[in-house]
UniProtKB/Swiss-Prot annotation:
Belongs to the FAM181 family. InterPro entries: FAM181, TEADIR3_omega_loop. Residues 107-157 are annotated as: Disordered. Pfam families: TEADIR3 (PF15238). This is Protein FAM181B.
Length: 419
């Protein structure tokens, strides 16, 4: 009956099955919808009286839940459809920042624009005077002349700042001895230093490198290149107020200067000359009472052996057991170990190993570390043996060789007798 009601009726909630004929079901559902949604304004008959065989409370509750669900779902769908998409506008941050910097620098370095011809260089300075002489000053015009006066004062302050900057960073034009400082102020205007545009270069040629002045071309004060003195940081020390690094290399002050650098610039060329002559104390002087005799100290604090050439160990690999020429140990003042201590042999060597042989002495010195590996007896130095080769040998696989020297391997292998 619910399927027939869904097919015949046009109401969307008919498939949720209410009894009765399709026409009566539609009318009853309409009355029920009015009853559940407009309970305060309900004036007709109640919905329970129109439905035959159905309980009014359950139907009203189910309809209310269904309508609230559809309402929330439709609102969510509408919000999702009306949500604006991601903006695809791309912002060029570099151009934006350049515009902002240009605007701010234009506000900070506000100066009168440069004249069109070199002969009219003094026109901005004469303009306020001419305006004051020719034009009468009525009351409304006086209110308009106040911003002009402020602009002229700002221009004068900017020109003063440009003179001070030109005296410090004068790399655009080298003024000869007879030139007046007014030409310097014209060559390096304030707008050219702050903004660097072509409109600011008044009375001088436009230089492309005017924005970034190299350090060597700036007229920096002498104190910028002065070395700080050693005596308490005051300029009255031995270095003097105008002494640079080049002056320190001359005369007797060079020795005093290099004495500050410590043993790094010593006269020795060996690596051992860079080490201090005094023994290095691991513990501070206050903890010397807690130390025991040197022979009872652990080996953790033993100093590293001295460098001999570029090798850490003086014995060459070809003669590990040979006697090495060693210097006698220098006696330490405090009885401790020094950095010039003679090297103790790391690997125990055989006493009768020859000095020029390559194999036996070296293998014998490594035998305590590989005690589980039994090495075959070493051959004479003149004879070349194949027992150490990577292939099969008679010593290692003696059971595969017959007394006549034939190979007893599987049939078909190389060296085996063919059947």
């Amino acid at each position: 009956m619910a399927v027939q009601a869904a097919l015949l009726s046009t109401h969307p909630f008919v498939p949720f099955g209410f009894g009765g004929s399709p026409d009566g079901l539609g009318g009853a559902f309409g009355a029920l919808e009015k009853g559940c949604c407009f309970e305060d304004e309900e004036t007709g008959t109640p919905a329970g009286a129109l439905l035959a065989g159905a309980e009014s409370g359950d139907a009203r509750e189910a309809t209310r839940d269904l309508l609230s669900f559809i309402d929330s779902a439709s609102s969510n769908i509408k919000l999702a459809l009306d949500k604006p998409g991601k903006s695809k506008r791309k912002v060029n941050h570099r151009k934006y920042l350049q515009k902002q910097i240009k605007r701010c620098s234009g506000l900070m370095g506000a100066a009168p624009p440069g004249p069109s011809s070199p002969g009219a260089a003094d026109t901005p300075a004469k303009r306020p005077l001419a305006g004051a002489q020719t034009v009468p000053v009525p009351v409304p015009a006086h209110g308009k002349a106040a911003p002009r006066r402020e602009a002229s004062q700002a221009a004068a302050a900017a020109s003063l700042q440009s003179r001070s900057l030109a005296a410090l960073f004068d790399s655009l034009r080298h003024v000869p001895g007879g030139a007046d400082p007014a030409g310097v102020a014209e060559a390096v205007p304030a707008a050219g230093l702050v903004r660097g545009d072509a409109a600011g270069s008044a009375g001088g040629p436009a230089v492309p490198g005017a924005r970034k002045v190299p350090l060597r071309a700036r007229n920096l004060p002498p104190s910028f290149f002065t070395e700080p003195s050693r005596a308490g940081g005051c300029v009255c020390g031995p270095s003097g107020p105008g002494v640079s690094l080049g002056d320190l290399e001359k005369g007797s002050e060079a020795a005093e200067f290099f004495e500050l650098l410590g043993p790094d610039y010593g006269a020795g060329t060996e690596a051992g000359a860079l080490l201090a002559a005094e023994p290095l104390d691991v513990f501070p002087a206050g903890a010397a009472v807690l130390r025991g005799p040197p022979e009872l100290e652990p080996g953790l604090f033993d100093p590293q052996p001295a460098m001999v050439g570029s090798l850490l160990y003086p014995e060459p690999w070809s003669a590990p057991g040979g006697p090495a020429t060693k210097k006698p140990p220098l006696p330490a003042p405090g009885g401790g170990l020094t950095l010039n201590e003679p090297l103790r042999s790391v690997y125990p060597a055989a006493a009768d190993s020859p000095g020029g042989d390559d194999g036996p002495g070296l293998l014998a010195s490594f035998t305590p570390f590989f005690s589980d590996c039994a090495l075959p007896p070493a051959p004479p130095p003149q004879q070349v043996s194949y027992d150490y080769s990577a292939g099969y040998s008679r010593t290692a696989f003696a059971g595969l060789w017959r007394p006549d020297g034939a190979w007893e391997g599987a049939p078909g292998e190389e060296g085996a007798p063919r059947d």
